Swiss-Prot record:
Record-given protein name: Neuraminidase
UniProt superkingdom: Viruses
Gene that produces this protein: NA
Region (Head of neuraminidase): 91-469
Organism: Influenza A virus (strain A/USA:Phila/1935 H1N1)
Active site per database record: 151, 402
Amino acid sequence: MNPNQKIITIGSICMVVGIISLILQIGNIISIWISHSIQTGSQNHTGICNQSIITYKNSTWVNQTYVNISNTNVVAGQDTTSVILTGNSSLCPIRGWAIYSKDNGIRIGSKGDVFVIREPFISCSHLECRTFFLTQGALLNDKHSNGTVKDRSPYRALMSCPVGEAPSPYNSRFESVAWSASACHDGMGWLTIGISGPDNEAVAVLKYNGIITETIKSWRKKILRTQESECACVNGSCFTIMTDGPSDGLASYKIFKIEKGKVTKSIELNAPNSHYEECSCYPDTGKVMCVCRDNWHGSNRPWVSFDQNLDYQIGYICSGVFGDNPRPKDGTGSCGPVYVDGANGVKGFSYRYGNGVWIGRTKSTSSRHGFEMIWDPNGWTETDSKFSVRQDVVAMTDWSGYSGSFVQHPELTGLDCMRPCFWVELIRGQPKEKTIWTSGSSISFCGVNSDTVDWSWPDGAELPFTIDK
């Protein structure tokens, strides 16, 4: 092959390669255009899964629901249809209590970023249940956890996270600056109540769907405080009880009716021989029942029941199965205060079923240890101490603490009745243990009309932590 032929051959090969490359590029452009057209067209149709995957460095909220997997948030499509939670259903018939959640916050917090908290409670909308809690503006096993045994400080805040999850900066939503709080959902939005400020000038800030709607200032200038559990909603109105005045004597107690975050009515209870603090409230057949803490002089629990016009009745649980702590041994009850060991107390709850009552209480009569549920078939109206069911949920040797009620509406469960549930705070740290901090985890149970079991679901953390040594 002479030099001219070589040049012609090489040139021909280069030309063929160039043409092939051009064809491939044109094909690539056509492929990209077709793919883009398909994606653009699909945006006008609802997919079967209707799921978005959004990847960011930080957690991103879409419809306030996410699952954090590394740095990828898989965001499920969620029905955000609003309904009105009527609260007109009666409580579901139950035979016992099934474990619903356990967050193990203290155990996880020995190595993970978990908030120092107290006063956790649960509340449910028609779509989800959330754990609310009062942080101390600090993490477990960190220097700022020092001294968090204190109840009221400017660093405390009401936050919430999905039920059953340990409360951390990565899954929690800020709700309100508060050292006393309540929250509930009316079917259309979240109402939060956060109390903060100095003891003699505290102010309750009401928010509806995160927007401030009203404030309530301390009217007795003696530590305004509220439920530390969920408020109760009936037919679009939500109801809460606040206390202002001495913790060891007669105080002032008010019921507030709230619609979309605005107070529409309030009354002060006429209860000269009663003491109402930290009430646990629930709706039942269109009315609201609250079972509270008597920190003044009762070892049984006071109650107040009211309708949507705030017409109310008051009393004490009559049963000789006493529900507070400290308390005497079970014996003869009273439909007024039982004065034996009546001073001090702990937040708690009960559920009324006609003349009967489910009583939640610590197993210990003198300390916050253990927890049990007692069914007294005549305990709402009779003073004997005979009961027919006892279910253990925390052993006598394990720490407990506050407890409170919450309900799951038919709009959430699909049942034709209101499901009763409760949570138990498992307090760890100061003042009973050798740590620099005080915090808690929580467990919760819901009533079922089927088989249940006795067991102990304790906090389980091994103390002290590194920061305590």
